[in-house]
Regions:
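Domain-level signal for soluble alpha/beta catalytic cores
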Residues: 1-200
Length: 200
């Protein structure tokens, strides 16, 4: 749940009323306030509440080359909604020499945590399964432009990309990464399982 200040700043940024730097300042302020609350409640591990993210998984997955987002409209409970889904567009890899917003977000959180004794910053990232769920099951693709139908090669590259990304966070002082994976719930969804069967 994002604070109203961030929601309003995001809206203003989208409408061109404020700059990216001004939006970041609002996020910084709210994240610092959140960490202060977490410490006050004696939590040994603190997070930034994912306050910088628009989507819990896509903002993270966009850190990888070969992965992009696709804007769609979808009817949900009778209402037309704008949604984004991830799509594999090329070879998936993590380039640590590029500028990564998620690493910058980590650096700021880490700097806040270091102000408090006995407090460790925790980085939350989405699990790799979301790449496959979005590209194959949500979008109904049976192959990718780069890998074709060779899913095993894609799996290998995604695993390597995650290893390289985690190593980069380690180099930036991260010692606690939480990998969030919501895909387990799909395993008890008959509609989902039928989609898996249909895709082979």
């Amino acid at each position: 749940i994002r604070p109203e200040a961030i929601k309003n700043a995001r809206k203003d940024f989208k409408e061109g009323k404020i700059t990216r730097e001004e939006l970041t300042k609002v996020e910084d302020k709210e994240i610092a306030a959140l960490v202060e609350k977490e410490v006050a409640h004696k939590l040994p591990y603190v997070t930034d509440g994912e306050f910088r993210r628009r989507w819990w998984h896509l903002d993270w997955l966009k850190e990888f080359d070969g992965f992009e987002t696709k804007h769609l409209t979808k009817e949900i409970n009778g209402t037309i909604n704008e949604i984004e889904l991830g799509v594999v567009t090329g070879k998936v890899f993590y380039d640590k020499n590029k500028k990564h917003p998620e690493v910058e977000a980590w650096d700021y959180l880490h700097s806040l945590a270091q102000k408090y004794e006995g407090v460790t910053a925790k980085k939350c990232i989405s699990g790799p399964n979301m790449i496959f769920i979005d590209h194959f099951l949500q979008l109904g693709n049976k192959e990718t432009p780069y890998y074709g139908t060779n899913v095993e090669a894609l799996i290998d590259d995604v695993a390597k990309a995650y290893q390289d990304a985690i190593a980069d966070f380690y180099d930036h002082g991260c010692r606690y990464i939480q990998i969030d994976d919501t895909s387990w719930t799909y395993l008890i969804d008959e509609t989902f399982l039928k989609k898996v069967d249909a895709l082979g």
